[in-house]
Swiss-Prot record:
It is found in: Vacuole membrane. Its main location: membrane. It is a peripheral membrane protein. GO terms for cellular component: Atg1/ULK1 kinase complex; phagophore assembly site membrane; vacuolar membrane. GO terms for molecular function: molecular adaptor activity; protein kinase binding. This is Autophagy-related protein 11. Belongs to the ATG11 family. Residues 557-585 are annotated as: Disordered.
Length: 1313
C-alpha cells in the first residue's frame, strides 16, 4: 500500500504492514495478504477471499494455524496472522476417480502459464541465413567487392535476424523473471513452487490439527459419559432402595401413620427395573462405541499422521529441489543468463544500418568502400559469435531453468493428485466418523444417561424422605409459630393503643374539670351567665369523647376474624389457590408441590382434630393418605409431635445427619430441648407447645424487634432493653450478661475465622462421604471390551466389567475406612462440637452486632454525662472475652487440622499403593492382549493365505480341464478340415492339367498384345511429361498469385492466416483475413529486387504463414519428371493424392472472403480519410487563426522574415560619430548596408545577445522626431565583426566587439488598416 497515496504517515504505514494477515489456498499454495481492519464483517472477508481464489463463499472453510476454526472476532482483535482456505468441493468425503481427478487438477492449475514461457528457437537458427553468412565471409576477402555480388534481401534478412535475436533473448529472460522463479525470503533464495508445496502441507497439517481438536472434544464427551455412568453406578440405589424402604415402614408420625405409605412401591419397582435396563444399554453402547473409536478413528488417525510424515519426506526433502548447491547453481544460472542477454542486446545496438553496409567508393561506382567491407566483416563476426557461442548458451540455460520449473510444477501437481485422491478422503472420513460418534454421545447416550439420572433421582426419595418430610413439618411448624408470635404482638399492640386511649381520655377529663373550676365565667353552676359559652356535664363528656379514635387491630384470615387471645390454631381458606390433586404428581411429589402454597390460618383446629380422629390406620391407603388429609393433619402439629417424629427416626437408625439437621431447625425456631444426663427425660423449653414467647424465644424476639424498629423516625432511635422486656413478660430468670461493646476489627477477624472453619468442616464432610469418582480414561474400557459379549447380558455383569478397576480401588477404600472407623467417629464428634460452637458464635456475633448498634447510640446520647474511663474499661473487658474465645477456637481448629491431615495421608498412601498395583495389572493385561491379538492376526493372515492358495489352485485346475477339452475338440475339427482340403486339391490338380493347354495359347496372344501396349505407353509417357510441365507452370503461377494476394493484403494492413481447427464443410478451408496494426510499416518496399517464385527469400519477408506452408508442398515440383513407370506411379499415388491436394487447399482463395475483406478495408480507409480530412480542415482553420493572431503580436527574439518588430533609437554617441564618418562608405556598399538619412542608428527591441539594426533604404521609414517605430521584417543580412576590421568604421559601423554578430534588418512600417 502506498502511504502517500492514502495520506498515511510512514509510521502508520509500517504498523499496517505489521498487521497484515496472510491468506493461503490449501490446494494451490497461493498466498495473498490483506489488512484485517479493511473488513467490517465476516461476510465481507469471505467475499474478498472468494474473489481472490475463485471459490464460492458457501464453499469456503477457514482455519487458523493450530486448526482452530476462524471467527471474525479473531480478525478484529488481531489474534490471527495466518488463515488457511479450504474448498468444500474437494472435502465432501467422496473419493475422486480418474476423470473427476483430472478435471479438478486442470481447474486448479489453469492459472499456470508455464507453456507460455517455453523457450522458442532463435531467429538465427536458419540454414539459408547460415549459408549466406558463410558466403559473405568468403567474398569479403575479394579486392573489389561490388554491390552486385551481394543479395540485398538476404543481407537485410541477416541484419534483421540479429536484431530480432536480441528481442528474443530479452523476452526469454523477462518471461523467466515474470514467473517469479526465484525470490528472496529471509536472505535465502527459495523456489516459488517449493514454497507452495510447503503451504499445501502446512494447510493440511492445520486440517489434521482441526481433526485432533474434534477428537479431543469426542474424547472429553466420552470420558464424561463414562464418568457419569460410573458415578451413577457407585451412588445408585438400584440394589439397596428396598432396605431404605423397610426403614420407612418403621418410621411413624403421630403414632399411627407410617411414612412408607406416602410412596408408591409398585412405581418404585418399575423405576428400578427401568434403571437396570438403561444401565445395561448404556454400558453396551459405550463398549461398542469404544470399539468403533479404536477401529474407525484412532487407527486411521495414526495412519493419517504417518501418511503426512511420508508426504513431508517425499515432497519437502527432495535433494534436487532443496539442496543448497542446487539453489546456488540456479542463482548462478540466472545471473549468467542475464549477462549473456545483456551482451546480445548490447551487440544488437552497435550493429550498422543497411546503408552503411552498402556505401560505395564513388558516386557512380558499384564497388563497396573499405569502411563498408569492414562493417560487413563486423556483422559476420557478430553473427558467428552469437550463433555459435552465445545463442546456444542462452538456449541451454533457459531450457535448464524451464526444465527445473517443469520438474517443480510436476512435483506440486503430484502432491495435489495424492491429496485429492487419497489423503483428503481419509481425513474427511475420520472427521465424519468423529461427528457420528459425537452425535451418538450427545443425543442417544446423553439422553439415556439423563433418563438414568432422573430415575436415580426418583429412587433417591426413598432415602431422602425422612429429611424431606421433617423439613416439611418444620416449615409448617414455623408458620404456626409465626402466627402465634404475630398474635401476641398484635394483642400487645391493642393493649398499648387502648392504654394510650385511656390515658388521653383521663387527661381530658381532668383538664376540663380543672379548666371549668379555674374559670367561673364558663361554669354553668356559678350564678349568672356572662358568656354565651357555658360548660355543663354534657359538654364535658363531649369534649372527652370527641376526636378520640377507636383503634383496634383485627387479624383477618379469610372470612374468620379471631379474637386477640383466641386459639393458637390456624385456619385455611375455603378454596386453595392450587389444585390439591395435580394428576401428574405422586404422593411425595404432591407433598413437595404444596411446599410453595400460601395458606390462610384460622379457627379450624376442631375440624382438623375430627379429621384425625375419623381416619384410623385401618382405613384404606388412598382415603387415609389423601393430600387434603395430610395438609389438615399437619395444621395441628405441635412441638412434641415433631420430637416424637425425630425419636422414631432414631429408633429406626436413620442417618444421624438428618436428625441433626431437623434438631437444628427446631433450635433456630426457638423450640429446642435439653436432655438431662441422668435419665434423658425430655423437657419442654418453655410454656406451651410452640415456645415460651418471651425473651428466650429467638423467633419471637426477632419479630418484636422488627415491629419496634418500624416506629423509628428522624432523630428518634428506639433502644430495646432485654431485662425490661423480661420483667414485663413475668419471667424471673437471671439476666444473661452481654458484652457492652465489640470492636469492629475484632468482629471482622471472627467473621474470617468462622468462614475458614466452615470451609474446613465442609471439606471434612465431603471426605467422610467417600472418595470422589475416578476419571477413568480408555484403559478400563479396553479391559472390559476384551470380554465376551455373553457376559454382557445383564446390567449387573456389564456394570461389574465397566467398574472392574474402580471397584477394587473402592473396596480398598472401604476397608481402610472400616479400619479407621474409630478415628472417624472421634473426628466426627469433634466436627459436631465445632459446628455447634460455630453456630453459637454466629448467633453471638449477630447479637453483638445488634448490641453494638444499641450501645453505640446510648454512648452517643450519654457522651456528655458518662465517664470515659468506664467506657474504656467496658470495651477492654469485652475485647478480652472475645480474645479468649478466639484462642479456644484456634486451638480446636489446630486439632481438627492435625486429625484431618493424618487421616488424609493414611488414605492417600493406601490409595497410591493400590493404584500402583492396579497399573501393573493393567500393563500386564495389555501386553497379554497385544500378544494374543498379534498371534490371532498372524493366524488369520496364514489362514487367509492358504485359503487363497487353495482357491487359486482349484480355479487353475478347472480352467486347465476346460482348455484341454476345448483344444481336443479343435484338433478334431482341424483334422476333418485337412482331409477334406486334400480331396479338393486332388480334384483341382486334375482340372489344372486340363487347363494347361489353354494357358499356352493365351500366353502367345498376350505377348502380341504386350508389344502393342509398349508402343502406347511410350506415347502416354510423352503426354504425361507435357502435362507435368504445364501442371508445374500452373502451380507456380498459382503460388505467385497467392504471394501477390498476400503482398497486396499486407500492403493495405491485412494479414491472411489459417485457423488450426476448422470445420470440414468450411468453404474457405479455415482461411481468415484479419487486420493487423503496424503491418504496413513492416512491409518492405515492393520495388526491391524480386526473388524466384519458389524461393524462400520472398516467403521470409511475408508475415502470412500460408505462403510458407504452401511452399513446403512444392519441393517435389523442383525435380525433373520421372522416367520410370514405378517412380511415376509413386508420384501419382503419393504426391498428387496427398501433397497436391494439400497444396490446392492451401492456395485456394475464397472469392467472397477476399472481396469482402478488401472492400471492408477500403471502406475503413475511406472512412478514416474522411475523418482525417475533417480533422485537417479543422486544424487548418485553427492554424490560420493562430497565424493571424501571431502576426499581430510583437516578436522579441529569434526574429525571422515577416515578424512584427519594435525599433528604438540607440543612445551611444560613438556609434553616431562612426556612422557620420562612414556614411560615404555605407552608401557605396548598398548591398550590405544601405544609406542613412540620419546618423542615429535604430535597433530592434529583442531579448538575447545578437544585435538587429534597422537599415532604412532611401528613407523608406520616416524616423524624424519619432521615439519608436513598429515595422514588419522584409529581409535580414548577417554580419560579423572580425578582429582585423573591428577598428575600421566600414567593417564595424556600430562599434561592436570583435567576433560580435549583428544583423542588418530591412523592414516595412506597419500601418493601421
Amino acid at each position: 500500500m502506498d502511504s502517500s497515496r492514502h495520506g498515511l504517515h510512514p509510521l502508520q504505514n509500517s504498523l499496517l504492514h505489521q498487521s497484515q494477515m496472510d491468506i493461503y489456498n490449501s490446494i494451490t499454495g497461493i498466498r495473498i495478504s490483506a489488512i484485517p481492519y479493511n473488513f467490517n464483517s465476516y461476510d465481507q472477508f469471505k467475499q474478498y477471499i472468494s474473489a481472490s481464489f475463485g471459490i464460492a463463499p458457501a464453499d469456503l472453510f477457514l482455519l487458523t494455524a493450530f486448526g482452530i476454526k476462524l471467527k471474525f472476532s479473531m480478525i478484529m482483535n488481531g489474534d490471527v496472522r495466518e488463515v488457511y482456505v479450504f474448498d468444500r468441493r474437494f472435502y465432501d468425503g467422496q473419493q475422486m476417480v480418474d476423470d473427476k481427478l483430472d478435471t479438478a487438477l486442470e481447474s486448479l492449475n489453469q492459472c499456470e502459464m508455464l507453456n507460455m514461457i517455453k523457450p522458442m528457437r532463435s531467429p538465427l537458427e536458419n540454414a539459408d541465413i547460415l549459408r549466406f553468412v558463410s558466403y559473405l565471409k568468403d567474398i569479403t576477402n575479394r579486392p573489389n567487392l561490388s554491390t552486385e555480388d551481394l543479395d540485398l534481401n538476404k543481407l537485410r534478412l541477416v541484419l534483421n535476424s540479429l536484431k530480432r535475436s536480441s528481442g528474443w533473448a530479452a523476452a526469454l529472460l523477462s518471461d523467466l523473471k515474470k514467473t517469479n522463479y526465484y525470490k528472496k525470503v529471509n536472505e535465502e533464495v527459495l523456489c516459488d513452487n517449493k514454497k507452495e508445496i510447503e503451504i499445501i502441507l502446512i494447510s493440511h497439517n492445520a486440517l489434521i490439527q482441526y481433526t485432533n481438536l474434534m477428537f479431543k472434544t469426542l474424547e472429553k464427551s466420552f470420558n464424561e459419559s463414562v464418568d457419569s455412568l460410573i458415578m451413577l453406578q457407585e451412588q445408585s440405589l438400584l440394589e439397596n432402595w428396598k432396605s431404605y424402604y423397610q426403614i420407612l415402614k418403621g418410621v411413624r408420625f403421630k403414632g399411627n401413620y407410617v411414612l412408607s405409605d406416602l410412596l408408591d412401591e409398585k412405581m418404585l419397582e418399575n423405576v428400578a427395573a427401568d434403571s437396570k435396563a438403561l444401565m445395561g444399554n448404556v454400558n453396551d453402547k459405550l463398549t461398542r462405541l469404544r470399539s468403533r473409536i479404536d477401529s474407525e478413528i484412532i487407527s486411521k488417525r495414526v495412519m493419517i499422521n504417518d501418511l503426512y510424515e511420508s508426504l513431508k519426506k517425499k515432497y519437502l526433502d527432495v535433494p534436487n529441489l532443496n539442496s543448497n548447491s542446487r539453489t546456488e547453481n540456479d542463482s548462478d544460472t540466472l545471473n549468467r543468463l542475464t549477462e549473456l542477454v545483456n551482451q546480445v542486446v548490447k551487440d544488437s545496438k552497435e550493429l550498422p544500418i543497411l546503408d552503411e553496409l552498402l556505401t560505395t567508393s564513388g558516386g557512380n561506382s558499384t564497388t563497396l568502400s573499405a569502411e563498408s567491407v569492414k562493417k560487413i566483416n563486423v556483422l559476420v563476426s557478430v553473427f558467428e559469435t552469437h550463433s555459435s557461442t552465445i545463442i546456444p548458451q542462452i538456449t541451454e540455460l533457459s531450457n535448464k531453468l524451464y526444465d527445473e520449473k517443469v520438474e517443480a510444477l510436476n512435483l506440486k501437481q503430484d502432491l495435489q493428485r495424492t491429496l485429492l485422491s487419497d489423503t483428503i478422503h481419509k481425513i474427511v472420513g475420520v472427521q465424519l466418523s468423529i461427528l457420528k460418534a459425537t452425535n451418538l454421545i450427545n443425543n442417544d447416550l446423553s439422553k439415556n444417561i439423563s433418563n438414568l439420572d432422573f430415575n436415580e433421582l426418583k429412587m433417591s426419595i426413598v432415602k431422602d424422605l425422612p429429611l424431606v418430610f421433617g423439613l416439611w413439618l418444620a416449615g409448617n411448624l414455623k408458620k404456626l409459630k409465626w402466627l402465634e408470635n404475630f398474635n401476641k404482638v398484635a394483642f400487645k399492640a391493642n393493649e398499648i393503643l387502648e392504654m394510650l386511649k385511656f390515658i388521653e381520655s383521663n387527661y381530658r377529663s381532668k383538664w376540663i374539670d380543672g379548666f371549668s373550676k379555674t374559670n367561673p365565667c364558663v361554669n354553668s353552676n356559678q350564678g349568672q351567665r356572662i358568656l354565651a359559652l357555658q360548660i355543663n356535664e354534657d359538654l364535658k363528656q363531649q369534649f372527652v369523647r370527641d376526636h378520640l379514635a377507636s383503634s383496634r387491630i383485627v387479624l383477618k384470615t379469610g372470612s374468620n376474624v379471631p379474637t386477640p387471645g383466641g386459639s393458637k390454631g390456624n385456619s385455611r381458606a375455603p378454596t386453595p389457590e392450587h389444585d390439591p390433586h395435580p394428576p401428574h404428581l405422586n404422593a411425595i411429589n404432591k407433598l413437595l408441590h404444596n411446599f410453595n402454597k400460601d395458606y390462610n390460618f384460622g379457627n379450624l383446629r376442631q375440624a382438623s382434630e375430627e379429621v384425625v380422629r375419623t381416619h384410623s390406620p385401618a382405613t384404606k391407603r388412598d382415603d387415609r393418605f389423601g393430600n387434603q388429609f395430610w395438609l389438615t393433619l399437619i395444621d395441628n402439629i405441635t412441638t412434641e409431635d415433631f420430637y416424637h417424629y425425630i425419636d422414631s427416626l432414631k429408633e429406626n437408625k436413620v442417618n444421624i445427619k438428618v436428625i441433626k439437621q431437623l434438631e437444628k431447625n427446631l433450635t433456630d425456631l426457638g423450640l429446642g430441648r435439653i436432655y438431662e444426663t441422668s435419665n434423658d427425660k425430655v423437657i419442654s423449653a418453655g410454656g406451651g407447645t410452640i415456645g415460651p414467647l418471651n425473651s428466650q424465644d429467638t423467633s419471637y424476639m426477632n419479630l418484636l424487634k422488627k415491629f419496634l424498629k418500624n416506629f423509628e423516625i428522624n432523630d428518634v432511635t428506639i433502644q430495646i432493653n432485654i431485662s425490661t422486656l423480661e420483667t414485663e413478660n413475668g419471667n424471673n430468670n437471671e439476666k444473661e450478661k452481654e458484652p457492652s461493646f465489640s470492636n469492629h476489627e475484632l468482629l471482622q477477624g471472627y467473621q474470617r475465622r468462622v468462614k475458614k472453619l466452615e470451609s474446613l468442616l465442609y471439606q471434612q464432610s465431603l471426605h467422610q462421604s467417600g472418595p470422589p469418582p475416578i476419571n477413568m480414561a480408555y484403559p478400563p474400557i479396553r479391559d472390559y471390551q476384551q470380554r465376551s459379549s455373553a457376559n454382557l447380558m445383564t446390567s449387573a455383569t456389564a456394570t461389574e466389567m465397566l467398574m472392574d478397576t474402580h471397584a477394587r480401588i473402592h473396596d480398598t477404600d472401604m476397608k481402610q475406612k472400616r479400619e479407621n472407623v474409630d478415628e472417624i467417629q472421634v473426628l466426627q464428634t469433634r466436627i459436631e462440637q465445632l459446628q455447634a460452637n460455630l453456630e453459637q458464635t454466629s448467633k453471638e456475633r449477630d447479637d453483638e452486632r445488634e448490641q453494638k448498634e444499641i450501645l453505640h447510640l446510648k454512648l452517643m446520647k450519654r457522651d456528655e454525662e458518662g465517664d470515659e474511663d468506664e467506657k474504656i474499661n467496658g470495651l477492654v473487658a469485652a475485647n478480652h472475652q472475645l480474645q479468649i474465645r478466639l484462642e479456644a477456637l484456634q486451638k480446636q481448629n489446630q486439632e481438627l487440622q492435625s486429625l484431618q491431615e493424618r487421616n488424609n495421608n493414611e488414605i492417600h498412601a493406601s490409595q497410591e499403593r493400590e493404584i500402583e498395583a492396579l497399573k501393573k495389572q493393567v500393563v500386564q493385561l495389555t501386553e497379554e492382549k497385544t500378544q494374543m491379538s498379534d498371534e490371532k492376526d498372524r493366524l488369520d493372515l496364514s489362514n487367509e493365505h492358504w485359503k487363497t492358495q487353495y482357491e487359486e489352485a482349484a480355479m487353475m485346475k478347472k480352467d486347465l480341464l476346460d482348455n484341454m477339452t476345448a483344444q481336443e475338440q479343435e484338433y478334431k475339427n482341424e483334422l476333418n478340415t485337412h482331409i477334406k482340403e486334400v480331396e479338393d486339391l486332388k480334384v483341382k490338380v486334375e482340372n489344372l492339367e486340363d487347363e494347361e493347354a489353354n494357358l499356352i495359347e493365351i500366353k502367345e496372344n498376350y505377348e502380341s498384345k504386350l508389344a502393342q501396349n509398349e508402343s502406347h505407353f511410350e506415347e502416354l509417357e510423352s503426354i504425361i511429361k507435357s502435362l507435368y510441365g504445364k501442371l508445374r507452370l500452373v502451380i507456380e503461377r498459382t503460388f505467385q498469385n497467392v504471394v501477390t494476394v498476400c503482398l497486396m493484403l499486407e500492403a493495405i494492413g491485412l494479414l491472411m492466416k489459417r485457423d488450426e481447427q476448422y470445420e470440414e464443410n468450411d468453404p474457405s478451408n479455415g482461411i481468415r483475413i484479419h487486420r493487423v496494426k503496424g503491418l504496413r510499416s513492416r512491409r518492405r518496399s515492393t520495388t526491391s529486387k524480386a526473388a524466384s517464385p519458389l524461393g524462400n527469400d520472398e516467403i521470409l519477408e511475408l508475415s502470412s504463414q500460408i505462403v510458407a506452408e504452401a511452399d513446403k508442398q512444392l519441393v517435389y515440383f523442383h525435380q525433373e519428371p520421372v522416367k520410370e513407370l514405378e517412380s511415376l506411379e509413386t508420384v501419382l499415388d503419393f504426391k498428387f493424392n496427398q501433397d497436391f491436394d494439400k497444396f490446392t487447399r492451401l492456395t485456394y482463395m475464397d472469392q467472397k472472403l477476399l472481396v469482402e475483406s478488401v472492400t471492408k478495408r477500403f471502406k475503413d480507409v475511406e472512412q478514416l480519410a474522411r475523418k482525417l480530412q475533417k480533422e485537417s480542415n479543422y486544424s487548418k482553420t485553427e492554424i490560420d487563426g493562430l497565424i493571424k493572431e501571431v502576426n499581430t503580436r510583437i516578436s522579441i527574439k529569434d526574429f525571422k522574415v515577416g515578424d512584427l518588430v519594435l525599433f528604438l533609437p540607440t543612445r551611444d554617441d560613438t556609434i553616431n560619430m562612426n556612422m557620420a564618418n562612414t556614411v560615404e562608405a555605407v552608401n557605396r556598399r548598398a548591398s550590405t548596408v544601405a544609406s542613412f538619412e540620419t546618423y542615429q542608428p535604430w535597433a530592434a527591441f529583442n531579448v538575447g545577445a545578437p544585435h538587429y539594426f534597422l537599415i532604412n533604404d532611401v528613407s523608406k521609414i520616416d524616423l524624424n522626431g519619432r521615439d519608436w517605430v513598429l515595422a514588419r521584417i522584409e529581409s535580414m543580412e548577417e554580419h560579423k565583426v572580425t578582429r582585423e576590421g573591428h577598428r575600421r568604421n566600414v567593417g564595424n559601423p556600430y562599434n561592436l566587439n570583435p567576433d560580435a554578430v549583428w544583423y542588418g534588418v530591412r523592414a516595412k512600417e506597419e500601418t493601421v488598416g
